[in-house]
């Protein structure tokens, strides 16, 4: 509907028209501030321009049957849609069923390479990883729903100093807990019960002869062994969140192509040597300073691996590349983009979304850290506590680039303070009514909408606003809009439900048809958030 109304107004006015939702529903379904934009051009008051444009629009043949009213108010032009238009879109939505909301397609389908999570396989996934994981998964769902082609990839950092440190940590734990030796740990190492678990499992799984080899050989084998175990656990954790990747890319394999990348960087005059190090001239592309790629000891920096990986990605020629990183990686954006320019790619194709910190509470106190993982809150612990769906909803309920704090006990309440419960409850009420109704679903679907009051029309309009919510959430990377949409629609439904008996009115079938639309919109919205909406709520819920 939004697209239709915008198109008609732009054709009549021959100007770009911004369509908004009025803050006060008494002002109608849509509004436009176009009069303010034209005030300087025509050197008139916005109030006068709004009156003139409202008259022009209302008398134009293309708007006949679209609106019940077009009113100029304080410089805005407010539009109330006709019931005929609402019914036309309602019928189409009910025919589309689970595809309702996907009819807004981008001008052309994009190929999107989406990389997210990519946590080092050196420990279990913690709550900080979950936010980017859930966001990336839902963004992919929405993009595909809108007709885009999406590849979701997890970049596995399976080489380098962190992996060796993992192997060393397991070896020291093996010596302490299996061999019962007195061990002195280094200042930096991986700790937690999971390291001890791996050490004990290695004792059962690996050949005893391994532990008679020299220490470097033992650490190398344990590094690979522990890394593989951690990656399996990470995949299990992601599965528990309902997240599945199309591809897992190995840094170790991709890094074999580093020589070819360095040759191209040298040809592009992107490198120089200073202080026995090899530097990238990233400052030429808005980086704060040049960056080291090869250190004095001839080892490679973390950035080098990122450059080789991005070269592999950009060879595949996607329309857009989206990375979801932790906010602490902000400084890496400019240097990676600089390397892409030197390698001959368009760095504007790369968009990096940053996930801010998460602070978890329970009874207004910091959530208990996991003994198994040391100073972290594990995803699995929180899923066991509140469930996958509640966790996904909360992580998506605020913009990715804002800090998120929430108390998990809120997600256990059975009232309006728990947003996901309140949405489930709305859908449950609808299904209970449909079961009690003397009318078949087919009767309800075939019932024309003729006798709706303003409040009922507004609720119907809200259900039909789902396509715009989906489109906006994708274009602005603002998936919180989907959560807000579902919360608002559920709240409007509860107000409608509590206002009077629905089944005991002469227009019961019309009202049930609105209820079907509420259920459809909530179900489709939740599906894109990776949540299965409930049709029944039991006492334990």
From Swiss-Prot:
Its EC number is 6.1.1.19. GO terms for cellular component: cytoplasm. Keywords: Aminoacyl-tRNA synthetase, ATP-binding, Cytoplasm, Ligase, Nucleotide-binding, Protein biosynthesis. One of its GO terms (molecular function) is arginine-tRNA ligase activity. It holds the Pfam family DALR_1. It catalyses: tRNA(Arg) + L-arginine + ATP = L-arginyl-tRNA(Arg) + AMP + diphosphate. SUPFAM superfamilies: Anticodon-binding domain of a subclass of class I aminoacyl-tRNA synthetases, Arginyl-tRNA synthetase (ArgRS), N-terminal 'additional' domain, Nucleotidylyl transferase. It is found in: Cytoplasm. InterPro entries: aa-tRNA-synth_I_CS (IPR001412), Arg-tRNA-ligase (IPR001278), Arg-tRNA-synth_N (IPR005148), Arg-tRNA-synth_N_sf (IPR036695), ArgRS_core (IPR035684), DALR_anticod-bd (IPR008909), Rossmann-like_a/b/a_fold (IPR014729), tRNAsynth_Ia_anticodon-bd (IPR009080). A motif ('HIGH' region) lies at residues 119-129. GO terms for biological process: arginyl-tRNA aminoacylation. The keyword Transport does not apply. NCBIfam families: argS. Monomer. Belongs to the class-I aminoacyl-tRNA synthetase family. This is Arginine--tRNA ligase. It comes from Helicobacter pylori (strain HPAG1).
């Amino acid at each position: 509907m939004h697209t239709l109304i915008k198109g008609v107004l732009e054709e009549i006015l021959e100007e770009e028209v911004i369509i908004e939702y009025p803050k006060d529903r008494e002002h109608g379904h849509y509004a436009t501030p176009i009069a303010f934009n034209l005030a300087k051009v025509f050197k008139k008051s916005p109030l006068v321009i709004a009156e003139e444009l409202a008259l022009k629009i209302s008398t134009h043949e293309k708007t006949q049957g679209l609106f019940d009213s077009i009113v100029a108010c304080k410089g805005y032009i407010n539009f109330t849609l006709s019931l005929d238009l609402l019914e036309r879109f309602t019928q189409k939505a009910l025919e589309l069923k689970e595809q309702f909301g996907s009819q807004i397609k981008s001008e052309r389908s994009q190929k999107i390479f989406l990389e997210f999570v990519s946590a080092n396989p050196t420990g279990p996934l913690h709550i900080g990883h979950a936010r980017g994981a859930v966001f990336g998964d839902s963004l992919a769902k929405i993009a595909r729903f809108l007709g885009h082609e999406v590849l979701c990839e997890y970049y596995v950092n399976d080489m380098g100093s962190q992996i060796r440190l993992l192997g060393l940590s397991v070896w020291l734990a093996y010596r302490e807990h299996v061999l019962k030796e007195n061990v002195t740990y280094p200042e930096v190492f991986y700790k937690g019960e999971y390291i001890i678990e791996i050490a004990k499992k290695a004792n059962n799984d690996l050949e005893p002869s391994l532990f008679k080899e020299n220490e470097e050989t033992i650490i190398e084998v344990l590094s690979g062994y522990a890394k593989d175990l951690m990656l399996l656990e990470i995949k299990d954790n992601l599965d528990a969140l309902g997240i599945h990747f199309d591809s897992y890319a190995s840094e170790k394999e991709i890094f074999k192509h580093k020589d070819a990348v360095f040759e191209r960087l040298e040809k592009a005059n992107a490198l120089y040597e200073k202080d026995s190090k090899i530097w990238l001239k990233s400052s030429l592309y808005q980086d704060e300073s040049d960056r080291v790629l090869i250190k004095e000891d001839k080892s490679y920096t973390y950035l080098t691996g990122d450059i080789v990986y991005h070269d592999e990605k950009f060879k595949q020629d996607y329309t857009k590349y989206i990375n979801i990183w932790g906010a602490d990686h902000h400084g890496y954006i400019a240097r990676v983009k600089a390397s892409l320019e030197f390698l001959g790619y368009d760095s504007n194709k790369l968009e990096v979304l940053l996930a801010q910190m998460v602070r978890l509470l329970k009874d207004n106190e910091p959530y208990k850290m996991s003994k198994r993982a040391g100073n972290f809150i594990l995803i699995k612990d929180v899923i066991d506590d509140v469930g996958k769906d509640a966790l996904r909803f909360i992580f998506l309920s605020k913009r990715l680039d804002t800090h998120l704090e929430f108390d998990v006990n809120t997600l256990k309440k059975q009232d309006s303070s728990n947003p996901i419960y309140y949405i489930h409850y709305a859908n449950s009420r609808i299904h209970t009514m449909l079961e009690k109704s003397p009318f078949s679903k087919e009767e309800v679907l075939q019932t024309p909408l003729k006798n709706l009051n303003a409040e009922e029309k507004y609720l119907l309009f809200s259900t039909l606003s789902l396509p715009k919510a989906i489109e906006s959430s994708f274009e602005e990377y603002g998936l919180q809009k989907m959560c807000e949409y579902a919360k608002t629609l559920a709240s409007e439904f509860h107000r409608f439900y509590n206002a009077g008996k629905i089944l005991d009115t002469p227009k019961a079938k019309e009202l049930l048809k609105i209820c079907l639309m509420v259920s459809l919109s909530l179900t489709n919205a939740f599906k894109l958030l990776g949540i299965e909406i409930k049709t029944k709520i039991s006492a334990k819920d």
